[in-house]
Design a protein with these regions (language model features):
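Arginine/glycine-rich "motif VI" loop of SF2 helicases in the C-terminal RecA-like domain
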Residues: 144-148, 199-200
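A residue-level signal for beta-strand positions that form part of recognition/binding surfaces
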Residues: 73-76, 96, 117, 151-153, ...
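Two-metal-ion RNase H-like nuclease active-site motif
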Residues: 97-99, 154-156, 270, 310-313
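Phosphate/adenylate-binding "loop-and-lid" substructures adjacent to NTP/NAD/dNTP-binding pockets
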Residues: 1-146, 166, 185, 191, ...
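Long, non-coiled-coil amphipathic alpha-helical linker/lever segments
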Residues: 148-161
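Surface loops and adjacent helix of pleckstrin homology
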Residues: 111, 122-123, 157, 170, ...
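Long, charge-dense accessory insertions within large macromolecular proteins
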Residues: 86-89, 162-340
């Protein structure tokens, strides 16, 4: 029974991932996806049965658009998630950490050489992304040239501020001729457009969260915070708070609340907070899986609740010959998805 459930969850979650990453049309809310993902992960740990295409082993989804493909020499992976501050504190292990905004947008990589932006790409499945260099001139805050001649590779999030999305959402349509229901889909559809004209005027912005290559001339090259601060000389504006080594629950909550307030004041779309080690050498020693790096955690906010009406229970036979109850309730919109 557990193996059958694992196979069903993998199939279901991969369908959801394809719709989310390649079609910009999520089929379920983030909360529902996370619930199913956690169930799959727990079953895999209990049984030791893990399929090669399990979402727990990979990140994102292989891009299938007509955009040119870009290979990432350094994989752009995700982070493990938690909803408990106590798990953040246990994870620190006496190390200094950064608290950063977890923006709800599209992970993007920028490459500069000889002071010029030469390539921009999406994360894709972490190994292969899409070339979106042609759309970068439409971004509002990405410099095309910088006073830095060495190679520089930075990753961050492409997004549309919440106030701009509210202003624009009723004036534009997605590929199916329907209004965009959430800012993440709007940003993704804009950034991944084949025609740069579709990205112009959509208020797309970029916020860096990591330096993958370069910036070795900063005072403390092993410090993630120091490298991020160095990006301010090139016009970027990262937001983070750095902790000491003995962080209490009260201070962790304070860091998180300050960042949440900053996001609200600046209309930044967020779905959590990232906690990651400041020391780059220590981060590297933590290792990784096929899905996530082990040098940080993504703190997810508590799920929102929505009211609807349960109309009836239907008993439906499955393809395995079992009879399963199905609750029929009124459609409710969650995270821009019509859930029924």
């Amino acid at each position: 029974m557990s193996v059958k459930r694992i196979k069903n969850l993998v199939k279901q979650l991969n369908e959801y991932r394809h719709a989310y990453y390649n079609q910009d049309a999520p089929l379920v809310s983030d909360a529902e996806y996370d619930r199913l993902f956690d169930e799959l992960k727990e079953l895999e740990e209990q049984t030791g049965f893990i399929l090669s295409n399990s979402p727990t082993q990979t990140v994102g989804y292989y891009p299938v658009s007509e955009l040119a493909k870009v290979t990432h020499p350094i994989p752009l992976l995700s982070l493990e998630k938690t909803k408990l501050i106590s798990e953040l504190l246990d994870f620190m292990k006496g190390q200094e950490v950064l608290f950063m905004l977890k923006l709800d947008g599209l992970t993007t990589k920028l490459i500069y050489e000889d002071g010029r932006l030469i390539q921009a790409s999406t994360r894709g499945d972490g190994e292969v992304g899409e070339d979106i260099t042609h759309n970068i001139p439409a971004f509002l805050n990405v410099p095309l040239t910088i006073p830095h001649k060495e190679r520089l590779v930075i990753t961050g999030e492409s997004f549309i501020p919440t106030n701009d999305f509210e202003r624009l959402k009723d004036t534009l349509r997605d590929g199916n001729g329907k209004p965009y229901k959430n800012g993440r889909n709007f940003a993704s559809g804009s950034v991944r457009s084949l025609d740069p004209k579709n990205c112009i005027g959509r208020c797309v912005r970029f916020l860096p969260f990591n330096v993958l290559e370069g910036m070795e001339d900063v005072p403390f090259p092993d410090s993630r915070a120091c490298k991020l601060e160095g990006l301010t000389h090139f016009g970027y504006c990262p937001f983070f708070s750095i902790s000491g080594t003995g962080l209490s629950k009260e201070y962790a909550e304070k860091f998180i609340q300050e960042l949440v307030s900053t996001a609200a004041n600046l209309h930044l779309p967020i779905d959590g907070i990232v906690m990651i080690f400041d020391s780059l050498s220590y981060s590297k020693s933590c290792g990784k899986t096929g899905h996530h790096y082990k040098d940080g955690l993504a703190y997810k906010f508590e799920d929102d609740t929505y009211e609807t009406f349960l109309r009836e229970i239907e008993w439906t036979p499955t393809r395995f010959g079992e009879i399963a109850p199905v609750g029929i309730f009124d459609t409710v919109e969650i995270d821009g998805c019509d859930v029924s």
